[in-house]
Amino acid sequence: MNDYKMTPGERRATWGLGTVFSLRMLGMFMVLPVLTTYGMALQGASEALIGIAIGIYGLTQAVFQIPFGLLSDRIGRKPLIVGGLAVFAVGSVIAALSDSIWGIILGRALQGSGAIAAAVMALLSDLTREQNRTKAMAFIGVSFGITFAIAMVLGPIITHKLGLHALFWMIAILATTGIALTIWVVPNSSTHVLNRESGMVKGSFSKVLAEPRLLKLNFGIMCLHILLMSTFVALPGQLADAGFPAAEHWKVYLATMLIAFGSVVPFIIYAEVKRKMKQVFVFCVGLIVVAEIVLWNAQTQFWQLVVGVQLFFVAFNLMEALLPSLISKESPAGYKGTAMGVYSTSQFLGVAIGGSLGGWIDGMFDGQGVFLAGAMLAAVWLAVASTMKEPPYVSSLRIEIPADIAANEALKVRLLETEGVKEVLIAEEEHSAYVKIDSKDRKSTRLNS
């Protein structure tokens, strides 16, 4: 069956899991633009501890991300997702009940330890057919960007109207809603599909970690989230010092995010169609350097701060679209799922480092010092990015080998002789082949027919 139209079950799985993932991300990110300003009223709060509270969820998520993904193969996807969301909800309740910064730190640490991203992707693979899996994954990727923008706006509005504790109560409700959706809306899976494109494989991490091109991309996503977190440690205070009250910050985030979303699409099309990924990537890193310098130089100049935020969000949103695509292109055939697992871990380590380091610098110096340190880190990243090579413009394809055809080296040789095929991995235990094909070669799409 080569039907590219999603079945009702596939559509329900896609929007159901996409909503579950978005609710969790909404809860994580709504805190980001408000904790620096409203959190200082908590007992024992300091700039350094606020930074730890912002970043601690990244540390626990980095620790549990890969183990939970592998554990879902044993205990089942749904039980792990429900358990992870329950831990997330408990962490939110602890934060909501706490009047001290240490309670917030504990709550945020628990929020991060409910790492469900890998299990969500694995369950999505179980519930969608091969020909529709890419569309389903893309839906979740798009929902992530939209969720981030919504969180930047809702966080300040809710906190101003109801307070920081109410925000955490609302996050707990979001997590509970996610549990209900997982149990009663997301379809049950009767089988686990072993798919190296979306799941992590034991024993394959050494190969992924030994790839220099992937290491540079993992360094990049770590830097990007160090810069995101450290910037949001300093930015709310800088906007307040410029005479723009915390209750109005959502207006800056809404306007700049909308412009950023509109600006990203032409760059992505240009990078893919013209095969200029490296040039656009390096341009983005350079734009972040400029953004951090503008923020550093702004001091209490409101409109200069807005310009810096705008430049940062354009580069950030573009990077969030480019980096996963580059990981997919650069990962060896059959190792994309593992490569994405390492990528996600690097991302959350960046969250932890950015929050903690940004808070420490803000406490020792000031917000300008945070932006200056960010500009220096971005300059290092720019130097690393400039050494990158143009990625191979390939698409990944998983082919289920018919039962009457042997999954062996001879089949691999035959596939490699097909026009447009660049790389092949035969997974005998799955009786499948993982193929990298030239993105513009339409003839090679016959492999899947």
Enumerate the language-model features and the residues they cover.
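Juxtamembrane intracellular "pre-TM" segments in multi-pass secondary transporters
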Residues: 2-10, 187-218
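Conserved MFS/SLC helix-loop-helix module at the cytosolic interface between two early adjacent transmembrane helices
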Residues: 63-99
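Helix-to-loop junctions at the C-terminal end of transmembrane segments
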Residues: 65-76, 263-276, 362
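C-terminal ends and interior cores of transmembrane alpha-helices
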Residues: 86-99, 286-300
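Cytoplasmic helix-loop-helix junction between adjacent transmembrane helices
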Residues: 107-144
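Helix-loop-helix hairpin linking two adjacent transmembrane segments in secondary transporters
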Residues: 140-183
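C-terminal membrane-cytosol helix-exit motif in multi-pass small-molecule transporters
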Residues: 173-192, 381-389
